Amino acid sequence: MTTKRKPYVRPMTSTWWKKLPFYRFYMLREGTAVPAVWFSIELIFGLFALKNGPESWAGFVDFLQNPVIVIINLITLAAALLHTKTWFELAPKAANIIVKDEKMGPEPIIKSLWAVTVVATIVILFVALYW
């Protein structure tokens, strides 16, 4: 049976997410995917430059030294750190760790994730700079 009744469709503006700080932060966090795509493309070009020999690699390094690219890469780093922070804050909510019949709070998990990140960063920098 068909009906001629028209369903109510609530109007939604394109700026709905600007009304609440929670939604603005959510859109910012989801927007961190754009700098991640930039870095991925930059990394792929770097790998191809490395594959194509010393002159190509020197051109890629010159490209990376451009002040505009340095600023874009700093923005990308900030976006990656924001994404990491929010991801680490989400991790304790997904894992129920019970110690002595009590649920562990989020602080030890978040601090241990940051500690692992710092250690991994130091190891990678040591290998890259001194190996």
Swiss-Prot record:
GO molecular function, one term: succinate dehydrogenase activity
CDD domains in UniProt: QFR_TypeD_subunitC (cd00546)
GO CC annotation: fumarate reductase complex; plasma membrane
Location of this chain's protein in the cell: Cell inner membrane
Membrane topology: Multi-pass membrane protein
Keywords carried by this UniProt record: Cell inner membrane, Cell membrane, Membrane, Transmembrane, Transmembrane helix
Residues spanning the membrane: 30-50, 63-83, 109-129
The keyword Transit peptide is annotated on this UniProt entry: no
Main location: membrane
Disulfide bonds: none
Entry superkingdom: Bacteria
Similarity annotation: Belongs to the FrdC family.
Role, per record: Two distinct, membrane-bound, FAD-containing enzymes are responsible for the catalysis of fumarate and succinate interconversion; fumarate reductase is used in anaerobic growth, and succinate dehydrogenase is used in aerobic growth. Anchors the catalytic components of the fumarate reductase complex to the cell inner membrane, binds quinones.
Complex and partners: Part of an enzyme complex containing four subunits: a flavoprotein (FrdA), an iron-sulfur protein (FrdB), and two hydrophobic anchor proteins (FrdC and FrdD).
Protein name in UniProt: Fumarate reductase subunit C
Native species: Escherichia coli O17:K52:H18 (strain UMN026 / ExPEC)
Gene: frdC
